[in-house]
């Protein structure tokens, strides 16, 4: 029997993976916890949101407020979806950190599996809720590029996570399906044991891909700083006349001079689309346009960058593990030859 791999191993078998995710996941969790300040809808959310974002939330959710000695406000449904996603992803960050502890997987597999199932269930709720918000938030309803980037992030998260659990599920039907994908014509217990190491490796790879994509939304806010510092020109962004009037509160006289296509006498209506310049130091609608353009660009940049980095890490990890396996096999053969 050939010797096992290097006991210290690489990647998941070392604490380096734990500390790597401690940094990434720590920021990820901190960002989402900090984001929960939005629950103060008439306070923190209104002050820190983009122009028009507060008005959109208030208008689309049927916002109700009562002025009394203690101000009370019903939180919009869309905002609850957003906050629930923040809470779920924060909890998932902590669970993911625990899953990187080698001793937990080796000595307490039942706990590792239980935490993994909790991660799967929570992300099953968190990713769709994020997609639902993305359909409308950040101007996605008027800008397909923004909507596609955020929805693609959610869909990839769900697909990668589902694939990672397919690789290690003990369900009989799914296990037979997995073995058939390996090429086993009549799957049995021996086939299950034969492909076990491959399944575990693939499970780890898809979990890494899941975490890389899952953190896209939080890290896009970091990448958004780049065009701000570099003072990049982000072109023009599509706005509906209804958004300019209802969310940004632009008056008829301003529309007539700046966006004449919105005027009724020119055939304009609430659904008419106009191009608004994205300018960080411009007017209210230009600042909002800059935010929407920047968020769309940051989401695409974060998604592509995280996917590339994840694939590089997975490829390097696989290559080095194979190299160690070959080295171990050669050493074992040398020992066998010398012992004869």
UniProtKB/Swiss-Prot annotation:
Keyword annotations from UniProtKB, A to Z: Glycoprotein, Membrane, Transmembrane, Transmembrane helix
Location in or out of the cell: Membrane
Residue stretches spanning the membrane: 15-35, 81-101, 118-138, 148-168, 219-239, 315-335
GO CC annotations on file: membrane
Topological category with respect to the lipid bilayer: Multi-pass membrane protein
Pathway: Secondary metabolite biosynthesis
Chief site of localization: membrane
Glycan attachment points: 171
Primary role: Part of the cluster that mediates the biosynthesis of a highly modified cyclo-arginine-tryptophan dipeptide (cRW). The first step of the pathway is perfornmed by the arginine-containing cyclodipeptide synthase (RCPDS) avaA that acts as the scaffold-generating enzyme and is responsible for formation of the cyclo-Arg-Trp (cRW) diketopiperazine. AvaB then acts as a multifunctional flavoenzyme that is responsible for generating the cyclo-Arg-formylkynurenine DKP, which can be deformylated by avaC. AvaB then further catalyzes an additional N-oxidation followed by cyclization and dehydration.
Protein name listed in UniProt: Ava biosynthesis cluster protein G
């Amino acid at each position: 029997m050939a010797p096992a791999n290097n006991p210290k191993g690489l990647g998941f078998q070392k604490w380096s993976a734990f500390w790597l995710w401690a940094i990434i996941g720590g920021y990820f969790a901190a960002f989402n916890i900090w984001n929960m300040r939005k629950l103060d809808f008439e306070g923190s959310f209104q002050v820190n949101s983009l122009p028009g974002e507060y008005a959109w939330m208030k208008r689309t959710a049927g916002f109700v407020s009562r002025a009394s000695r203690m101000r009370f406000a019903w939180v919009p449904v869309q905002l609850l979806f957003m906050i629930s996603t923040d809470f779920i992803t924060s909890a998932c960050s902590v669970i993911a950190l625990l899953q990187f502890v080698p001793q937990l997987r080796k000595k307490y597999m039942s706990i590792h599996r239980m935490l993994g199932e909790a991660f799967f269930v929570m992300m099953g709720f968190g990713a769709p809720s994020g997609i639902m918000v993305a359909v409308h938030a950040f101007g996605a309803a008027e800008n397909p590029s923004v909507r596609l980037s955020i929805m693609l992030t959610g869909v990839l998260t769900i697909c990668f996570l589902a694939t990672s659990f397919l690789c290690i599920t003990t369900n009989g039907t799914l296990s037979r399906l997995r073995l058939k994908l390996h090429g086993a014509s009549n799957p049995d217990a021996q086939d299950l044991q034969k492909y076990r190491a491959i399944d575990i490796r693939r499970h780890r790879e898809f979990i890494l891909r899941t975490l890389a994509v899952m953190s896209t939304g939080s890290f896009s806010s970091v990448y958004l700083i780049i065009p701000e510092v570099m003072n990049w020109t982000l072109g023009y962004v599509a706005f509906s006349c209804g958004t300019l009037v209802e969310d940004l509160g632009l008056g008829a006289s301003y529309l007539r001079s700046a966006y004449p296509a919105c005027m009724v006498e020119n055939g304009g209506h609430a659904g008419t689309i106009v191009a608004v310049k994205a300018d960080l130091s411009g007017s209210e609608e230009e600042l909002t346009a800059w935010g929407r353009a920047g968020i769309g660009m940051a989401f695409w940049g974060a998604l592509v960058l995280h996917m590339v980095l994840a694939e590089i890490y997975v490829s390097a990890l696989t290559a080095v593990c194979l190299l160690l396996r070959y080295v171990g096999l050669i050493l074992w053969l040398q020992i066998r030859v010398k012992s004869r």
